[in-house]
Protein backbone atom coordinates (compact mmCIF):
# COMPACT_ATOMS: atom_id res chain seq x y z
CA UNK A 1 0.00 0.00 0.00
CA UNK A 2 2.89 2.35 0.65
CA UNK A 3 3.70 2.58 -3.06
CA UNK A 4 0.15 3.57 -4.05
CA UNK A 5 -0.20 7.13 -5.25
CA UNK A 6 -2.67 9.45 -3.53
CA UNK A 7 -4.87 9.21 -6.63
CA UNK A 8 -4.87 5.41 -6.52
CA UNK A 9 -5.72 5.35 -2.82
CA UNK A 10 -8.49 7.85 -3.43
CA UNK A 11 -10.01 5.66 -6.16
CA UNK A 12 -10.01 2.57 -3.94
CA UNK A 13 -11.71 4.14 -0.91
CA UNK A 14 -15.45 3.60 -0.45
CA UNK A 15 -17.01 6.99 0.25
CA UNK A 16 -20.70 6.21 -0.35
CA UNK A 17 -22.74 3.51 1.43
CA UNK A 18 -26.13 2.47 0.06
CA UNK A 19 -29.25 1.42 1.95
CA UNK A 20 -32.71 0.36 0.79
CA UNK A 21 -34.91 -2.61 -0.13
CA UNK A 22 -33.99 -4.40 3.07
CA UNK A 23 -30.25 -4.28 2.41
CA UNK A 24 -27.43 -1.93 3.33
CA UNK A 25 -23.68 -1.61 2.89
CA UNK A 26 -23.18 -0.43 6.47
CA UNK A 27 -24.13 -1.59 9.97
CA UNK A 28 -25.02 -0.08 13.35
CA UNK A 29 -21.38 -0.47 14.41
CA UNK A 30 -20.14 1.98 11.77
CA UNK A 31 -21.04 5.27 13.48
CA UNK A 32 -17.50 6.59 13.10
CA UNK A 33 -17.75 6.09 9.33
CA UNK A 34 -21.44 6.73 8.64
CA UNK A 35 -22.40 8.97 11.53
CA UNK A 36 -25.13 7.97 13.95
CA UNK A 37 -27.96 8.59 11.51
CA UNK A 38 -26.32 6.72 8.63
CA UNK A 39 -25.42 3.75 10.79
CA UNK A 40 -28.94 3.51 12.19
CA UNK A 41 -30.53 3.73 8.73
CA UNK A 42 -28.33 0.85 7.63
CA UNK A 43 -29.31 -1.20 10.67
CA UNK A 44 -33.02 -0.51 10.17
CA UNK A 45 -32.72 -2.01 6.69
CA UNK A 46 -31.02 -5.10 8.07
CA UNK A 47 -33.90 -5.46 10.55
CA UNK A 48 -36.45 -5.30 7.75
CA UNK A 49 -37.93 -1.97 8.83
CA UNK A 50 -39.35 -0.12 5.80
CA UNK A 51 -37.00 2.78 5.10
CA UNK A 52 -36.91 4.90 1.93
CA UNK A 53 -33.75 4.06 -0.05
CA UNK A 54 -30.77 6.36 -0.09
CA UNK A 55 -27.09 6.58 0.60
CA UNK A 56 -24.70 7.97 3.17
CA UNK A 57 -21.54 9.91 2.37
CA UNK A 58 -18.91 8.90 4.91
CA UNK A 59 -17.34 11.13 7.54
CA UNK A 60 -14.03 10.45 5.78
CA UNK A 61 -15.13 12.79 2.98
CA UNK A 62 -15.39 15.64 5.49
CA UNK A 63 -11.93 14.83 6.85
CA UNK A 64 -10.51 14.61 3.33
CA UNK A 65 -12.07 17.95 2.41
CA UNK A 66 -10.40 19.82 5.24
CA UNK A 67 -7.11 17.93 4.94
CA UNK A 68 -6.82 18.69 1.21
CA UNK A 69 -7.39 22.42 0.88
CA UNK A 70 -11.19 22.05 0.66
CA UNK A 71 -11.12 19.64 -2.27
CA UNK A 72 -13.31 16.56 -2.57
CA UNK A 73 -11.99 13.07 -3.40
CA UNK A 74 -11.73 12.41 -7.14
CA UNK A 75 -13.81 9.24 -6.98
CA UNK A 76 -16.67 10.77 -4.99
CA UNK A 77 -18.53 12.05 -8.05
CA UNK A 78 -18.69 8.65 -9.76
CA UNK A 79 -19.66 6.92 -6.51
CA UNK A 80 -22.48 9.42 -5.97
CA UNK A 81 -23.77 8.96 -9.51
CA UNK A 82 -23.80 5.19 -9.07
CA UNK A 83 -25.60 5.45 -5.72
CA UNK A 84 -28.18 7.81 -7.18
CA UNK A 85 -28.78 5.46 -10.10
CA UNK A 86 -29.38 2.55 -7.74
CA UNK A 87 -31.74 4.70 -5.65
CA UNK A 88 -33.63 5.65 -8.82
CA UNK A 89 -33.98 1.98 -9.76
CA UNK A 90 -35.51 1.17 -6.38
CA UNK A 91 -37.89 4.13 -6.46
CA UNK A 92 -38.84 3.81 -10.12
CA UNK A 93 -38.30 7.51 -10.81
CA UNK A 94 -35.37 9.60 -11.99
CA UNK A 95 -33.66 12.62 -10.48
CA UNK A 96 -34.27 15.62 -12.73
CA UNK A 97 -36.74 13.73 -14.94
CA UNK A 98 -39.51 16.14 -15.97
CA UNK A 99 -42.44 13.70 -15.98
CA UNK A 100 -41.77 11.79 -12.75
CA UNK A 101 -38.94 13.43 -10.77
CA UNK A 102 -37.19 11.78 -7.86
CA UNK A 103 -36.90 14.15 -4.91
CA UNK A 104 -34.28 13.64 -2.24
CA UNK A 105 -33.62 15.06 1.20
CA UNK A 106 -30.08 15.86 2.27
CA UNK A 107 -29.57 15.43 5.99
CA UNK A 108 -26.33 16.07 7.82
CA UNK A 109 -25.10 13.73 10.51
CA UNK A 110 -22.20 13.30 12.89
CA UNK A 111 -20.36 10.61 14.81
CA UNK A 112 -21.89 11.96 18.01
CA UNK A 113 -25.55 12.82 18.53
CA UNK A 114 -26.16 16.56 18.11
CA UNK A 115 -29.94 17.15 18.36
CA UNK A 116 -31.05 20.38 16.73
CA UNK A 117 -27.55 21.24 15.53
CA UNK A 118 -27.49 19.57 12.12
CA UNK A 119 -28.87 21.07 8.92
CA UNK A 120 -31.31 19.60 6.39
CA UNK A 121 -32.32 20.50 2.84
CA UNK A 122 -35.56 18.91 1.60
CA UNK A 123 -37.17 18.47 -1.82
CA UNK A 124 -33.94 18.59 -3.81
CA UNK A 125 -34.86 17.82 -7.41
CA UNK A 126 -37.70 20.31 -7.71
CA UNK A 127 -37.01 22.80 -10.50
CA UNK A 128 -39.04 24.82 -12.98
CA UNK A 129 -38.75 21.82 -15.33
CA UNK A 130 -39.82 19.14 -12.85
CA UNK A 131 -42.60 21.06 -11.08
CA UNK A 132 -45.22 20.50 -13.85
CA UNK A 133 -44.60 16.75 -13.83
CA UNK A 134 -45.05 16.49 -10.07
CA UNK A 135 -48.22 18.60 -10.23
CA UNK A 136 -49.58 16.26 -12.89
CA UNK A 137 -48.65 13.22 -10.81
CA UNK A 138 -50.11 14.51 -7.53
CA UNK A 139 -52.91 16.71 -8.85
CA UNK A 140 -52.00 19.19 -6.12
CA UNK A 141 -50.27 22.39 -7.18
CA UNK A 142 -50.38 23.81 -3.66
CA UNK A 143 -48.45 20.84 -2.28
CA UNK A 144 -45.81 21.13 -5.02
CA UNK A 145 -45.24 24.89 -4.78
CA UNK A 146 -45.21 24.71 -0.98
CA UNK A 147 -42.51 22.04 -1.26
CA UNK A 148 -40.62 24.19 -3.77
CA UNK A 149 -40.59 27.30 -1.56
CA UNK A 150 -39.33 25.15 1.34
CA UNK A 151 -36.45 23.96 -0.85
CA UNK A 152 -35.64 27.56 -1.78
CA UNK A 153 -35.67 28.66 1.86
CA UNK A 154 -33.53 25.80 3.14
CA UNK A 155 -31.04 25.87 0.27
CA UNK A 156 -30.55 29.63 0.56
CA UNK A 157 -30.07 29.36 4.32
CA UNK A 158 -27.92 26.23 4.56
CA UNK A 159 -25.95 26.24 1.30
CA UNK A 160 -25.89 29.75 -0.11
CA UNK A 161 -25.41 31.61 3.19
CA UNK A 162 -24.09 29.38 5.99
CA UNK A 163 -21.95 26.94 3.98
CA UNK A 164 -20.61 29.81 1.87
CA UNK A 165 -19.50 31.56 5.05
CA UNK A 166 -21.51 34.71 4.37
CA UNK A 167 -22.31 36.97 7.28
CA UNK A 168 -26.04 37.77 7.52
CA UNK A 169 -26.81 41.18 6.07
CA UNK A 170 -27.50 43.66 8.90
CA UNK A 171 -27.43 40.69 11.26
CA UNK A 172 -30.57 39.23 9.68
CA UNK A 173 -30.18 35.83 8.03
CA UNK A 174 -31.71 35.06 4.65
CA UNK A 175 -34.14 32.56 6.14
CA UNK A 176 -35.57 35.21 8.46
CA UNK A 177 -35.93 37.60 5.52
CA UNK A 178 -37.82 35.00 3.49
CA UNK A 179 -40.07 34.18 6.43
CA UNK A 180 -40.84 37.90 6.73
CA UNK A 181 -41.91 37.93 3.09
CA UNK A 182 -44.42 35.19 3.86
CA UNK A 183 -45.83 37.20 6.76
CA UNK A 184 -46.07 40.30 4.56
CA UNK A 185 -47.91 38.32 1.89
CA UNK A 186 -50.33 36.92 4.48
CA UNK A 187 -50.99 40.37 5.88
CA UNK A 188 -51.56 41.89 2.44
CA UNK A 189 -54.05 39.16 1.53
CA UNK A 190 -55.65 39.00 4.99
CA UNK A 191 -54.53 35.41 5.53
CA UNK A 192 -54.20 34.13 9.09
CA UNK A 193 -52.30 30.86 8.66
CA UNK A 194 -49.84 29.42 6.15
CA UNK A 195 -52.54 26.91 5.25
CA UNK A 196 -54.61 29.77 3.83
CA UNK A 197 -52.10 30.27 1.02
CA UNK A 198 -52.97 28.68 -2.33
CA UNK A 199 -50.72 27.12 -4.91
CA UNK A 200 -50.66 30.42 -6.78
CA UNK A 201 -49.62 32.21 -3.59
CA UNK A 202 -46.68 29.86 -3.03
CA UNK A 203 -45.75 30.09 -6.70
CA UNK A 204 -45.68 33.88 -6.50
CA UNK A 205 -43.70 33.81 -3.26
CA UNK A 206 -41.16 31.41 -4.78
CA UNK A 207 -40.30 34.01 -7.42
CA UNK A 208 -40.21 36.78 -4.81
CA UNK A 209 -37.83 34.59 -2.76
CA UNK A 210 -35.49 34.25 -5.73
CA UNK A 211 -35.34 38.03 -6.15
CA UNK A 212 -34.60 38.49 -2.44
CA UNK A 213 -31.86 35.84 -2.55
CA UNK A 214 -30.24 37.52 -5.54
CA UNK A 215 -30.37 40.94 -3.91
CA UNK A 216 -29.19 39.75 -0.49
CA UNK A 217 -26.64 37.05 -1.31
CA UNK A 218 -25.50 38.28 -4.72
CA UNK A 219 -26.15 34.93 -6.40
CA UNK A 220 -29.04 33.23 -8.13
CA UNK A 221 -30.88 30.28 -6.62
CA UNK A 222 -29.89 27.37 -8.90
CA UNK A 223 -32.78 26.06 -10.95
Please annotate each region the language model reported:
Residues 3-223:
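Nucleotide/phosphate-binding sheet-loop regions of phosphoryl- and nucleotidyl-transfer enzymes
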